[in-house]
């Protein structure tokens, strides 16, 4: 009983390490990230790709209200997995820091600089009583001096740089797929195809344009932009990943035949 009470104390105390060096609330925040739908980042030779799963809980929900890819600055995009409200707070913080850098130094903020400012902010919430960690992971991609950069933040406030990564649900399976198929020499279009194929690999190899979000930051223009449904559909159709709804139609026909 005493040991159980001690563990509960470490559970509730965000600023207290357990005897084996763990911060339980940070670990629980990481579990919250795993419950979110997947987000993917891919660094290519001429840009960065961000792709997210935008599955909704009800057909009555407007898909446009599900935002998982955000513009932090003209040359930086951010994808999230985990608690949407926590992500929104960090996105707002990132945008403010980008504006401050522009006003203070007269130049756009660097991707690595912005990532470190975000992770410093996140890390503060692992040391202060009366608060909790952010239950969200971010993928931050952008261009600096013609070079694509791709970073991850986690609830502990630790930054990592990647060539390709996934966060959220099925991250292990998606990362295995990326490791097997990633090529550093691929271009931006090939990076989009890889990200979509990785998402499809954990979704029965089928995706709909409305159920995903895709954004790119191009080295040539150094500009963030999101793909339209038509552009996403073209990529999915070319890769034979487009969900045509035939399975649902077949199931409906089977049900009708049974009722008859």
UniProtKB/Swiss-Prot annotation:
Keywords of the record: Cytoplasm, Proteasome
InterPro entries in the cross-refs: Ntn_hydrolases_N, Proteasome_alpha, Proteasome_alpha-type, Proteasome_asu_arc, Proteasome_asu_N, Proteasome_sua/b
Acidic residues biased stretches: 240-260
Activity control, per UniProt: The formation of the proteasomal ATPase PAN-20S proteasome complex, via the docking of the C-termini of PAN into the intersubunit pockets in the alpha-rings, triggers opening of the gate for substrate entry. Interconversion between the open-gate and close-gate conformations leads to a dynamic regulation of the 20S proteasome proteolysis activity.
Family matches, as Gene3D superfamilies: Glutamine Phosphoribosylpyrophosphate, subunit 1, domain 1
Start and end residues of each stretch annotated as Disordered: 237-260
Family assignment from sequence similarity: Belongs to the peptidase T1A family.
Name under which the protein is recorded: Proteasome subunit alpha 1
Species classification: Archaea, Methanobacteriati, Methanobacteriota, Stenosarchaea group, Halobacteria
């Amino acid at each position: 009983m005493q040991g159980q009470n001690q563990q509960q104390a470490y559970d509730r105390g965000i600023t207290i390490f357990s005897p084996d060096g763990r911060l339980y609330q940070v670990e629980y925040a990481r579990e919250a990230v795993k419950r979110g739908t997947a987000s993917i980042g891919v660094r290519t030779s001429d840009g960065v790709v961000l792709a997210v799963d935008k599955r909704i809980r009800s057909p009555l929900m407007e898909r446009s209200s599900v935002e998982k890819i955000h513009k932090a600055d003209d040359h930086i995009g951010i994808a999230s997995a985990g608690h949407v409200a926590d992500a929104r707070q960090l996105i707002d913080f990132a945008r403010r820091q980008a504006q401050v850098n522009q006003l203070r130094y007269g130049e756009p903020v660097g991707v690595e600089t912005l990532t470190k400012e975000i992770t410093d902010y996140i890390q503060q919430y692992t040391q202060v009583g009366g608060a909790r960690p952010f239950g969200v992971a971010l993928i931050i991609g952008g261009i600096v001096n013609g070079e694509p950069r791709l970073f991850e933040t986690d609830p502990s406030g630790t930054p990592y740089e990647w060539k390709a990564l996934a966060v959220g649900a099925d991250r292990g399976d998606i990362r295995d797929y990326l490791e097997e198929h990633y090529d550093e020499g691929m271009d931006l279009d090939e990076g989009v195809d890889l990200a979509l194929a990785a998402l499809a690999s954990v979704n029965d190899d089928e995706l709909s344009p409305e159920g995903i979000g895709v954004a790119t930051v191009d080295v040539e223009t150094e500009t963030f932009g999101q793909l339209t449904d038509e552009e996403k559909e073209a990529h999915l159709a070319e890769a034979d990943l487009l969900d045509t709804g035939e399975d649902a139609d077949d199931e409906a026909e089977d049900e009708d035949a049974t009722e008859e």
